[in-house]
Amino acid sequence: MVKMVSFRSKVWCGVEKGCRHLPIVLNATLVFSITAEVSYLVLMEAPLEPAQKESEWSAHWKTMHLLAQYFMLGSIAWNASLFLKTSPSIRGVFFNGDIVGQGWRYCYTCETHTPPRCSHCYDCNVCVLRRDHHCVFFGQCVGFRNYRYFLNCLLFMWAGLLYAVVMNAEVFIVILKEGVTFHSFMLLMVPWIMLVTGQVTAQAFTFAFIADTCVVGFLLVSAFLFFHVGLMLRGQTTREWYSARRPYNLGVLANVRECLGEHWYICWLCPLIPSDLPGDGINFKVTGSLDPMK
């Protein structure tokens, strides 16, 4: 009986880990699919017919496009990797019991006192320093130590998707070359149905699906990026935004430095640029009331 319970618990843990990594696999698949499709558009200058093109791209122009594209892809992958490797939790952090004061709480799950802005994540099953939210796309919490990589990843995803949308303008031109018809509308809105019913080829479906994904992804990432940039400029976390609290607003420049580190003005160019955070994730300067009602 004990062996059966142990086996079930191991299976459940495996399923749980698989579910946690599934969003990462799906996101990586989408990113590389978009990159491959845009590379094809750059190299083959498809799907426009030669008669529809005003001019052909030179080899140097194509090379510049590909270099810019793979720079953005590399930045996304590197920031995402460092985000996942950088634990935002309290594991390995020593809390001095003498400094427990206003804003501190006791976590009964972790069985320890936790500092202000720290909260327990039931998905990660641990308390997270300056916890912002649990990112379902990466399967990990966004907190004090990895916020920089999260924000930079959003920035390069936004730039990459904007570039992909512009490059996929050719796809929309081809689909809408005869105007907004029932066929073109269905191909853009529900390309899966058009493929299953045999109304379009696999190639047309692929171009339409990825073009749609680029537009939808760009809108979603734009919303996330602008929201989190706004939070950073106000010195807030998502949880503090929900409760309309701004007790840690130190001014725009200081708020940016708190999130991105001392070299905030250049660290966004490359995740390998060192940029030490000015705080420790435990003690924060307070400029307002910690009471959410004030």
Which stretches of residues belong to each language-model region?
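Membrane-associated feature with strongest affinity for ZDHHC
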Residues: M1-K294
